């Protein structure tokens, strides 16, 4: 088995150029996802929890937030497949005392029932076998304790993905099909499918709440356009289209124009819809 466990393709992806893009844009993306972070942690009961797990922790902002909520005596582990993102997580001045582990949550041999709480912000949609992954994650959580995560609802309900994607498709003519249930941001956009996976993996008291929210940024329209060239569905379509530099400039300018249309009171805003998922192990 490779160092990426049973998710070799995703391991390579997140440890190469795309992973580096998320390292570079970590601060910018944390700003955009701040409201969603609040939604994830809203009403989370960490009483009596001494060991917490953050699945797909990336550069560690959610891990640090979890540690703050759980208190100084708690032990918090952030797990991710990307060493690039974990290196950034470990370098943060507030990461002292947190454990950051490079591993594949689908196949990693967790200590049985070693955690009393598990959370994730958009970190659980990238498994080759979601059933096996959640079954393995469940084994790491004490019986009767909560797993809480957020994931994306369908593409059409998320402007931050849809708008840049449509722009690239319109300009380049590239064919871009929705990835469906393949590992990726939208893998769990079908809530019935998601619920069935969790039930089959052995979770109970499953609640999937649809939450309408927004992604906002104080960045300039130019800086926002640069980010859209490097992350998200627009970026994926650009990779597929392989446009010339001239066409890339056209795409960037279109992103700037769209940003100006969305700009109000100093904020660029995109409508977003997510699922907030709670399940008991």
Question: Residue ranges of each PLM-predicted region?
Answer:
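Short glycine-dipeptide loop
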Residues: 72-73, 141-147
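Class I SAM-dependent methyltransferase SAM/SAH-binding core
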Residues: 51-108, 132
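Core SAM-dependent methyltransferase catalytic element
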Residues: 201-204, 225-226, 273-281
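Conserved class I S-adenosyl-L-methionine
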Residues: 1-49, 61-65, 85-88, 92, ...
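Conserved catalytic/acceptor-binding region of the Class I
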Residues: 131, 146-219
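A short SAM/SAH-binding and catalytic strip from SAM-dependent methyltransferases
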Residues: 116-131, 153
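A short acidic, Gly/Pro-enriched loop at the edge of an enzyme's catalytic core
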Residues: 106-117
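C-terminal helical/coil "lid" or tail adjacent to the Rossmann-like core of SAM-dependent
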Residues: 2-28, 207-265
